[in-house]
Amino acid sequence: MTDLSTLFHAAILGVVEGLTEFLPVSSTGHMIIVGHMLGFTGDKAETFEVIIQLGSILAVVVVFWRRLFGLIGIHFGEVPHEGKTNGKLKLSHIILAMLPAVTLGLMFHDVIKSLFNPQSVMYALVIGGVLLITAEILKPKTPKAEGLDDITYRQAFMIGCFQCLALWPGFSRSGATISGGMLMGVNRYTASEFSFILAVPMMMGASGLDLYKSLHFLSASDIPMFAVGFVTAFVVALVAIKTFLALIKRISFIPFAIYRFIVAAAVYWVFM
């Protein structure tokens, strides 16, 4: 039987996952710190993180379901905040953006796994923050892509190349792809939307594979803990995504970069 303290810890981790998964601040860095503080580590903790990531992914599907169906040619009227779309953003754009990270991820899987340690994550947090600042400084004054349907195949592929940086734990997948999009001439809001949509197949594939490998760690007694974490991550991620998209219309990514430096300092203080 799962005790209340375990469920409370599951809810806390669900909140952390939901808040940080799609913000350019690195969910990995936060989960390492909070998991350490709660004493929740090991194989079961890793399996739990996979489960709650699926909750975050579901939140993206709920927010962008019209766009996701539109990728395969099924349209349900106007997309909120965009109006009528011309359907130029297709599944082929997403597949092209996925290829670099999928290829490198399969080739260097063991190397990437070895990077899941506090010191490596700390460095990734700092360098990812520098990239966010660089993107804000060097982005074109006049964006070439103002909406998702303006994104070219070249831009999609280059964003996918930047996504390879996120194979380094702590770098932040959204931070890498959004920065890459901005440097390629995609405006901040659209780069964020593309990053979220790209996250669905990427994270579902990675999480699905990790879950399959971790099935032997699951037991019926863990269902309440997993359920609480999953639902909490879903609800919090839903709010976080909508709030983030509204916020970045008014502010730059500099505050997120500064926050990353603070988290890196926290990792150093806790683990070094």
UniProtKB/Swiss-Prot annotation:
Note: Bacitracin is thought to be involved in the inhibition of peptidoglycan synthesis by sequestering undecaprenyl diphosphate, thereby reducing the pool of lipid carrier available.
Keywords: Antibiotic resistance, Cell inner membrane, Cell membrane, Cell shape, Cell wall biogenesis/degradation, Hydrolase, Membrane, Peptidoglycan synthesis, Transmembrane, Transmembrane helix
Protein name per UniProt: Undecaprenyl-diphosphatase
Species, as recorded: Photorhabdus laumondii subsp. laumondii (strain DSM 15139 / CIP 105565 / TT01)
Membrane topology: Multi-pass membrane protein
PANTHER family the record matches: UNDECAPRENYL-DIPHOSPHATASE (PTHR30622:SF3)
Catalyzed reactions: di-trans,octa-cis-undecaprenyl diphosphate + H2O = di-trans,octa-cis-undecaprenyl phosphate + phosphate + H(+)
Keyword DNA-binding assigned: no
Alphabetized InterPro entries for the sequence: UppP
A GO BP annotation: cell wall organization
MF terms (GO), sorted A to Z: undecaprenyl-diphosphatase activity
Pfam (any one): BacA
GO CC annotation terms, alphabetical: plasma membrane
Top class in the EC scheme: hydrolase
Cellular localisation: Cell inner membrane
Cell inner membrane listed as a keyword: yes
Record-annotated membrane-spanning stretches: 22-42, 45-65, 92-112, 118-138, 189-209, 228-248, 251-271
Entry EC no(s): 3.6.1.27
